[in-house]
Amino acid sequence: MYKQILTIGYIKFLVVAMDELNYLINYLANKDSVREEILKLSREITRDCAMLIRKIHKSDDKDEFKDKLNEISEKIKKLNSLATFPEFVGYLSTPQQEFVEALSLYMIKFDNKIPSFKELDFIKEENYILGLADVIGELRREVLEAMKNDNLAEVERYFKFMEDLYEFLMNFDYYHVVDNLRRKQDISRGILEKTHGDIVTFIQNLKLREHLKRVQIGLSQE
């Protein structure tokens, strides 16, 4: 009788254990599937943003990029909806920052303004800040391109945005809650200082060339 009770109890345990085992297997299988989808979409967004940034540098057509920006923003919203497990939230960082960087470059180049955080309510606060830090390096590329074309007005316009972004970035010193904040501040400072030096040299050369041109005109009129 005692053995029979034990046997019945063991069978019941096995039934319960199998039910729980099936649940746990399904739970982890679903979690792994979500993780794979997040990683795939994250890589896709990052790749799209990198390609978009390269194209923005080379183009003067504002309307060319609107559809792609909207497409990427929808992908990010989908990515956000997938990150239902707390441990997956970290996967949002890179794609969100890359999007902020691409959108900021676009708006600075074509609209002469920086996107506000309120406009990007699907972007985490930390990623908005770090994305703006990254665009400083892209603005340096625009400064250098403007120098090649002797466009002093554009050089000064882009550099002013670089300064404004750096000042904005330096308002934050929450290094224990925002990963890479200090590193990006240091990188931004270095880019700003290097670009300032390049601009000083550019203006000096521009003035020298203008002076030589006036001298040549004067000599030709004698």
Swiss-Prot record:
Annotated SUPFAM superfamilies: Translin
Organism: Methanocaldococcus jannaschii (strain ATCC 43067 / DSM 2661 / JAL-1 / JCM 10045 / NBRC 100440) (Methanococcus jannaschii)
NCBIfam families linked: PRK14562.1-4
CDD domains: TRAX (cd14820)
GO cellular component: cytoplasm
GO molecular function ontology, one term from the record: RNA binding
Source taxonomy: Archaea, Methanobacteriati, Methanobacteriota, Methanomada group, Methanococci
Highest rank taxon of the organism: Archaea
Stored Pfam families: Translin
PANTHER family the UniProt entry points to: TRANSLIN AND TRANSLIN ASSOCIATED PROTEIN X
InterPro entries: Translin_fam (IPR002848), Translin_sf (IPR036081)
Name this polypeptide is given: Uncharacterized protein MJ0175
